[in-house]
């Protein structure tokens, strides 16, 4: 059902599908998990901002269902794509995705993934006040990366 909704023509079906991915993911076989991730990636890259917004809204929940290797290899690029979206309503939702990714990656591995620190800094400096506000509002929830970002900004 999730895959069928994701392939539908109308954006309303795709929007509905984004919230359903985390439910069957854990119980699915490896090949089906791969398929689910590919279809979700398609929703992240959808041409409709409403679909991308809901994909950004639900990616954090989806990330929590995955193992660390999958998060690093496949979800960080999706996060980066959403973080560079032209719609600020999509970019502001990436703060929660960053938090979910940071929680899934062990703290000792986070410095080796400079992309998280770079992404946090770019969200701090975003042109939209709504995105900057969201980062400030959720700053204390960003484990490990927040400390590295603070040190990096102070050293500048």
What is the predicted role of each segment?
Residues 1-6, 30-44, 69-83, 108-124, ...:
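HEAT/HEAT-like alpha-solenoid repeats
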Residues 5-6, 20-27, 43-44, 58-66, ...:
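Hydrophobic residues within the alpha-helices of tandem HEAT/HEAT-like
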Residues 9-10, 47-48, 86-87, 127-128:
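Short inter-helical turns and helix N-cap capping residues of alpha-solenoid HEAT/ARM repeat scaffolds
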Residues 11-13, 138, 142-156:
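Short, compositionally biased segments
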Residues 17, 36, 55, 74-75, ...:
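N-terminal alpha-helical segment
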């Amino acid at each position: 059902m999730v895959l069928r909704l994701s392939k539908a023509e109308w954006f309303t079906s795709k929007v509905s599908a984004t919230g359903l991915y985390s439910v069957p993911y854990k119980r699915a076989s490896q090949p089906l998990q791969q398929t689910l991730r590919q279809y979700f990636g398609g929703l992240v890259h959808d041409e409709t901002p409403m679909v991308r917004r809901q994909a950004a809204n639900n990616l954090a929940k989806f990330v929590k269902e995955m193992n660390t290797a999958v998060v690093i290899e496949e979800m960080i690029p999706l996060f980066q794509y959403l973080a560079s979206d032209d719609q600020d309503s999509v970019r502001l939702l990436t703060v929660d995705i960053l938090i979910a990714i940071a929680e899934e990656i062990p703290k000792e591995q986070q410095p080796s993934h400079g992309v998280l620190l770079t992404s946090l800094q770019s969200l701090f400096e975003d042109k939209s006040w709504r995105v900057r506000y969201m980062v400030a509002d959720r700053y204390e929830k960003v484990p490990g990366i927040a400390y590295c970002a603070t040190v990096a900004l102070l050293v500048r």
